[in-house]
Amino acid sequence: MKVRPSVKPICEKCKIIRREGKVMVICENPKHKQKQG
């Protein structure tokens, strides 16, 4: 899980979702998981 100021999809399988007011990227590849912080 990477925490960064701006989250971007890295590959075509990355999905941007909102959870508890935070923007997150979820993906099949665990390296692509990101959270805005």
Swiss-Prot record:
Organism this protein belongs to: Desulforamulus reducens (strain ATCC BAA-1160 / DSM 100696 / MI-1)
Source organism, top-level taxon: Bacteria
Keyword Ribosomal protein: yes
Molecular function GO labels: structural constituent of ribosome
Protein family per UniProt: Belongs to the bacterial ribosomal protein bL36 family.
Name the UniProt record assigns to this protein: Large ribosomal subunit protein bL36
An annotated GO BP: translation
GO cellular component: cytoplasm; ribonucleoprotein complex; ribosome
Pfam families: Ribosomal_L36
Alphabetized UniProt keyword annotations: Ribonucleoprotein, Ribosomal protein
